């Protein structure tokens, strides 16, 4: 595996006489650009130049001599301004590409890291918006990838089921039941008209609180159904009301007061966040005694840490930039490492149809909800395309492209390779052709070699997703793997009854491609069809 090769290269470099006594940076293996003709490229010499105080090209020249002695390295070369390019032995490629392991071998209990990723967390005051789909795709994919790499990771949806908005929702629903317009500051969506029609008879004697409870529960169930249809299953749906049942906001406030971090002014209780780069201090308890949402958020995050999570990832919508400095200040006040709080802000989604933007307004009635978009193009296309951009990039979601069943559509392109590989396996089985157990002594064609090298980089792509908190590395990898498979399939006849040995080896290669694509799609929450 590449992890072992990396360690072997580091061991050789760190013990080399030419670098003796120097503090050297770790080695980072990356795929070599096609024009180099190599398999692996290192920028190590340029990183080492800072500590060695030498020209990167001189360092690269010295490093190449050392790396050339590493087992399974066929050759190494250098290029300006200090790149190191490595060609691997075919035997290493053939054996390593068959290794299915993703998790590092750790002794039991060694990895104490526990990650909690909170995402979507939309208010239960209306249907889920399209942007929630982007957050869901991002969050759920990361949870799956973390766990695949052996890092314990849970997912959570925070439900704002109490407070003023819940009361306003109840008032708005009651107005609809009575054939009236909701108050100006209430909720005016057509979904409340449909809800009112369902309960008009049964709700004649209801109080406003009962209307509120019914509406909140109805919409929470709607959100849960939408997430399930989107192939997202949260570890826990955490309700804000749970915080108040346990008096956690009050306890969090006492904690801050004891540390001298909360103060009273103008009849309210404040948290001094300006000293931590916030633009103003924040109110925790209003002058009328009502706690703010910020106090509830502090209590909620304290609860996360108290449950044993070591890293808290909050995936937030584009309008939450102001939330980050105050929450970082709160984490610091709770006595936790600021680095343990990882906010990710994803940008908006613009829907494109017929080459034009779809107006995202309630009046247009077009694709306002995630449910409508999912039903129109399918959860697979939504999830893959949402995951294909970095969170900080604005996204144009092309509805026409998402519906295409051609290679222009990246999710179809990748899924089709899985279906083709499955079809090849079925054909071989019908012809009673056996798959090889390994690729020992099998001479690789250039297309086979390229394909196997791409299989090697699967775990590397997953690690990059974790490093950058973005699954786009995986979608890019799968698209490239699919392209390599097409080149292999066009150049190499797989099922050839006259050459059973070659067929056996190529069936094994196809099977490994199928496995990698299936796993990769699974980590993105996308299906891997056996037939298309």
From Swiss-Prot:
Full protein name: Arginine--tRNA ligase
Similarity comment: family membership: Belongs to the class-I aminoacyl-tRNA synthetase family.
MF (Gene Ontology): arginine-tRNA ligase activity; ATP binding
NCBIfam families listed in its UniProt record: argS
Residue interval(s) of motif 'HIGH' region: 122-132
Keyword match Protein biosynthesis: yes
Reaction equation(s) it catalyzes: tRNA(Arg) + L-arginine + ATP = L-arginyl-tRNA(Arg) + AMP + diphosphate
Source organism (scientific name): Elusimicrobium minutum (strain Pei191)
EC identifiers of the protein: 6.1.1.19
């Amino acid at each position: 595996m590449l992890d072992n090769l990396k360690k072997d290269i580091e061991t050789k470099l760190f013990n080399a006489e030419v670098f003796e006594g120097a503090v050297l940076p770790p080695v980072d293996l990356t795929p070599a650009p096609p024009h180099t003709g190599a398999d692996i490229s290192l920028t190590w010499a340029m990183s080492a130049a800072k500590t060695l105080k030498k020209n990167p090209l001189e360092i690269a020249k010295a490093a190449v001599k050392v790396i050339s002695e590493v087992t399974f390295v066929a050759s190494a070369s250098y290029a300006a301004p200090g790149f190191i390019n490595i060609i691997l032995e075919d035997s290493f490629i053939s054996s390593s590409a068959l290794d299915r392991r993703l998790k590092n071998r750790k002794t039991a209990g060694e990895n104490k890291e526990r990650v909690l990723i909170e995402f979507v967390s939309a208010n239960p005051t209306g249907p889920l918006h399209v942007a929630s789909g982007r957050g869901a795709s991002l969050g759920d994919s990361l949870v799956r990838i973390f766990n695949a790499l052996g890092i314990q990771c849970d997912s959570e949806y925070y439900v704002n089921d109490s407070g003023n908005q819940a009361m306003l929702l109840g008032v708005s629903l009651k107005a609809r039941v009575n054939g009236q317009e909701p108050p100006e500051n209430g909720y005016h969506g057509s979904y409340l008209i449909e809800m009112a029609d369902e309960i008009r008879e049964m709700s004649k004697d209801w109080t406003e609180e009962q209307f509120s409870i019914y509406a909140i529960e109805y919409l929470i169930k709607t959100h849960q159904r939408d997430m399930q249809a989107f192939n997202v299953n949260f570890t826990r749906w955490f309700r804000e009301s749970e915080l108040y049942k346990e008096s956690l906001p009050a306890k969090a406030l006492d904690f801050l007061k004891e540390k001298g971090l909360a103060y009273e002014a103008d009849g309210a209780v404040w948290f001094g966040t300006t000293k931590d780069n916030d633009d103003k201090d924040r109110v925790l308890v209003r002058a009328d005694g009502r706690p703010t949402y910020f106090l509830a958020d502090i209590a909620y995050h304290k609860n996360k840490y108290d449950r044993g999570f070591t890293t808290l990832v909050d995936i937030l919508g584009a309008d939450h930039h102001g939330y980050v400095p105050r929450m970082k200040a709160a984490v610091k006040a709770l006595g936790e490492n600021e680095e343990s709080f990882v906010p990710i802000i994803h940008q908006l989604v613009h829907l494109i149809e017929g080459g034009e933007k779809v107006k995202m307004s309630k009046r247009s009635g077009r694709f306002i909800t995630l449910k409508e978009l999912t039903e129109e193009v399918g959860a697979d296309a939504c999830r893959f395309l949402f995951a294909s951009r970095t969170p900080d990039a604005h996204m144009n979601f092309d509805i026409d492209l998402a519906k295409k069943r051609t290679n222009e559509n990246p999710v179809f392109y990748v899924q089709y390779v899985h279906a083709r590989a499955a079809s090849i396996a079925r054909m071989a089985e019908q012809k009673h052709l056996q798959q090889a157990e390994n690729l020992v002594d099998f001479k690789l064609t250039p297309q086979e070699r390229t394909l196997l090298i791409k299989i090697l980089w699967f775990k590397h792509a997953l690690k990059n997703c974790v490093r950058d908190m973005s699954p786009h590395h995986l979608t890019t990898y799968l698209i490239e793997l699919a392209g390599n498979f097409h080149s292999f399939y066009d150049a190499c006849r797989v099922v050839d009854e006259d050459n059973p040995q070659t067929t056996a080896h190529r069936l094994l290669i196809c099977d490994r491609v199928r496995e990698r694509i299936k796993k990769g799609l699974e980590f993105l929450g996308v299906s891997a069809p056996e037939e298309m």
